[in-house]
Regions:
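Conserved PLP-enzyme active-site core in the AAT-like
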Residues: 2-281
């Protein structure tokens, strides 16, 4: 077999396994007997660490399997049957999830992007145009807004942009959901001014990516307002996103949120990106 250790790969950020600290902890705990479905001490510890990192002590935290399942589950849980989710026309749920949202019975209502992002003004106009239409009761109602941090183009929402989106969403009773599949990279970017605390303040739900950020798999959904999505555990199960061996995800997120690892784990990627940027100038 060809030795590929010295080769550079640009295809993806999840071609390798997991951070050594995660693998070490998984091996140390491998033969322990724990309760299933995320009711174990490791998962509870991970949830508490995430609440602390987000400065959201009352938040509901749930660990799911992967990004597409997470998006499909959260969006379905937040929408009524006749509602759709607003997203950029380049948004991940609109372009690279094989119609998973539509498969769940909800339309993705796309708006034109600017560098991968959408604005508060666009949301305001979309809502106004919807209710100004005499036939709006025959149409798919905008029921929530989806963004990702970073975007599909690798751009970042600023704190000011996020706050503006949050304001218009709350004025129009539209939950704001942030896809954080690659959130570790956003947090590590020198251009970033949005913290986990900001995400908890300005969004109705967001997830902290594990699969693309150092874990073998797993995403942590944070719902800042406790009880905001009733029976979410059961909804996760219904969508096939619940792990029987839940502690495997709990251990991973427990390690990611020990000694600031998650906040550091994206830095090598940022440093490499700066090297590429400098070389292309």
């Amino acid at each position: 077999m060809e030795n590929t250790e010295s080769r550079l790969y640009f295809a993806s950020d999840y071609m390798e396994g997991a951070h050594p600290a995660i693998m070490k902890k998984l091996m140390e705990t491998n033969l322990e007997k724990t309760v299933g479905y995320g009711q174990d001490p490791y998962t509870e510890d991970a949830k508490e660490k995430i609440r602390e990192a987000c400065n959201a002590p009352e938040a509901d935290v749930f660990l799911l399997v992967g990004g597409t399942q997470t998006n499909a589950t959260v969006i379905d849980a937040l929408l009524k049957s006749y509602q759709g989710v607003v997203a950029a026309d380049t948004g991940h749920i609109a372009t690279h999830e094989s119609g998973a949202i539509e498969f769940g019975g909800h339309k993705v209502l796309t708006v034109p992007h600017e560098d991968g992002k959408i604005s508060a003004a666009q949301i305001e106009k979309l809502v106004k145009d919807f209710y100004d239409d005499a036939n709006y009761e025959h149409m798919v109602m905008p029921g929530m807004v989806y963004i990702s941090q970073p975007t599909e183009y690798g751009t970042l929402y600023s704190r000011e942009e996020l706050a503006a989106l949050s304001k218009v969403c709350r004025e129009n009773h539209l939950p704001l959901y942030v896809d954080g599949a690659r959130l570790a990279y956003a947090l590590a970017s020198p251009e970033n001014d949005v913290t986990l605390t900001d995400l908890a303040e300005f969004s109705d739900a967001f997830y902290i990516g594990g699969t693309k950020c150092g874990a073998l798999f797993g995403e942590a959904v944070v719902i800042p307002q406790k009880g905001r999505i009733p029976h979410f555990f059961t909804i996760i199960k219904q969508h096939g996103a619940l792990l029987a061996k839940g502690r495997i995800a709990g251990i991973q997120f427990g390690e990611l949120f020990t000694d600031g690892l998650y906040l550091r784990i994206g830095k090598p990627a940022m440093e490499a990106a700066e090297q590429i940027k400098a070389a292309l100038k």
